[in-house]
Amino acid sequence: MATQMVNQSTGNSLFCTSTYSNISLDNDMYGLHDLSKADMAAPRLIMLANVALTGELSSGCCDYTPEGERQMAELTTVNDNSFSDSEGDRLEDSPSMDIQSHNFIMEMEPAECSKEGTSENDGTLLSNTLEVEVQKDKRTPSPTDDKYKCVKSKPFRCKPCQYKAESEEEFVHHIKIHSAKIYVDNDSNKKAQGNEADSSISEESDVSKGPIQCDRCGYNTNRFDHYLAHLKHHNKAGENERVYKCTICTYTTVSEYHWKKHLRNHYPRILYTCSQCSYFSDRKNNYIQHIRTHTGERPYQCILCPYSSSQKTHLTRHMRTHSGEKPFKCEQCSYVASNQHEVTRHARQVHNGPKPLTCPHCDYKTADRSNFKKHVELHVNPRQFLCPVCDYAASKKCNLQYHIKSRHSGCTNITMDVSKVKLRTKKGDIGVADVDANKQTENGNIIDKSVEETVKAEKRESCGKAKKSIVNLVDGQVAKKRRLSSTQKKIKTSDARPEKILDKSRKSSCVKRKSDLLENSNDTQTSTV
């Protein structure tokens, strides 16, 4: 806990011994009760302020010299990453900073002071981002002035936004918008020098967000679709629409939401960093969605097909393929699509949209920032996807997935999802694959023929057995006759001839008997008559 003390020295003091012998700046005045030394040493950068009082007194008691100076040192942001929109709003609403407790800096009522020498406590300039300047008043105040009050017109100035305030109260209220924490440190000379160097580098590195610039308000971007969306705001609200500008860089926008979202890039609250790659984000939901790309988790399942996704937006976009909905339309033609990405790609390919992003290593140009980052990563780290089983390294994730499915399909320790990867045959392996296929087909044909022959033989045997059983039931000798040889058949035919003659004689005798019986019956009838 740091406190700026103004102590009385022998014969050399800015304030009299009876009134201002020992003055201490309260930490609650700057809202420092929640800070500790650990916060100062932490990598999270915070706001520093060094308050100093300097001045000179003439040889006459209570006389104010023209060289008298009262200076309040600069309030400087040292890359405060802990700022957020919600915290800034909370600070504006809470009257935690009481500026009335240090009004003695601006109003001093000298009493009995010594006549000897001068005393000077030099303030230290921390940086040149946010600055409070109290200009020297070269005129000699007359005794008619109210208690020798130093009256200046708008001595407080904020460098980033050029804001000027007449009173310290207005300026402190303005400062609360820029920072979340203000710290009073009386030993920050060395830190100030390093911070000045860092701030100069950051100012030199500030570049435009994109080459596409709006002529009406100065809005700039590197994406043509964002520029077209920006023009729609002008068409709706007119040219006098409010423009939100960033006080740290040259970013401008007409949307308050995008402006607050941009401020998080300068003042992130908490950074979520991925342990497997270089990804980081200040939003937990985005971080969770990114982790799913490593684990392969897909909690969002389509109810109409086996499709699954790690993000809800992807599932919503997929459902449009079932419903046939295409709400996104190209502004230059009648092309419609189910998502904005396809419309943007259509505009670049068909209508030759601008491609402001150029690769510094080759002639690659694009308007898509994500594709641009992926392309540059191929130059910086060409093989960043490593196989967990072998020494294989790939430049793209899809290549690694194909490698795992084709070479390590039996490994169970791999967490990467390769279910949607389709294996393909290379050009050099086509001939070998054809020979193997021909051999397999020939072997299959031979096997099929042998199976067919065995089936036919079994069918023949079963049919023969069935026929034999039926013939034996009807006539037991039919089967024997079929088995007789030719000689046996001749013998049987010779033996069968006399049998046929006997049968004929028997038939003739029977006929004679019948005729005799008929004649006898006729005779009896005539006799009776």
UniProtKB/Swiss-Prot annotation:
Keyword Repeat among UniProt keywords: yes
One Pfam family of this chain: zf-C2H2
Region (Disordered): 188-210, 484-529
Gene Ontology biological process: negative regulation of DNA-templated transcription; positive regulation of neuron differentiation; positive regulation of transcription by RNA polymerase II; regulation of alternative mRNA splicing, via spliceosome; regulation of osteoblast differentiation; response to hypoxia
Ranges annotated as biased composition (Basic and acidic residues): 492-506
UniProt keywords, alphabetically: Cytoplasm, Developmental protein, Metal-binding, Nucleus, Repeat, Repressor, Transcription, Transcription regulation, Zinc, Zinc-finger
Positions annotated as zinc finger (C2H2-type): 156-178, 212-234, 244-266, 272-294, 300-322, 328-351, 357-379, 385-408
Entry GO MF terms: zinc ion binding
Stretches that traverse the bilayer: none
InterPro entries: Zinc_finger/UBP_domain (IPR050688), Znf_C2H2_sf (IPR036236), Znf_C2H2_type (IPR013087)
Intracellular or extracellular location(s): Nucleus; Cytoplasm
Listed Polar residues bias regions: 518-529
GO cellular component: cytoplasm; nucleus
Main location, first listed in the record: nucleus
Statement: the UniProt record of this protein carries the keyword Secreted: no
Domain of life where this protein originates: Eukaryota
PANTHER family per record: RE1-SILENCING TRANSCRIPTION FACTOR, ZINC FINGER PROTEIN
UniProt remark on domains: The C2H2-type zinc finger 5 is required for nuclear localization.
Purpose: Transcriptional repressor which binds neuron-restrictive silencer element (NRSE) and represses neuronal gene transcription in non-neuronal cells. Plays a role in the early development of the nervous system and is required for proper patterning of the neuroectoderm during gastrulation. This involves the correct speciation of the neuroepithelial domain and adequate development of the non-neural ectoderm.
The protein's name: RE1-silencing transcription factor B
Protein source organism: Xenopus laevis
Biological classification of the source: Eukaryota, Metazoa, Chordata, Craniata, Vertebrata
Encoding gene per record: rest-b
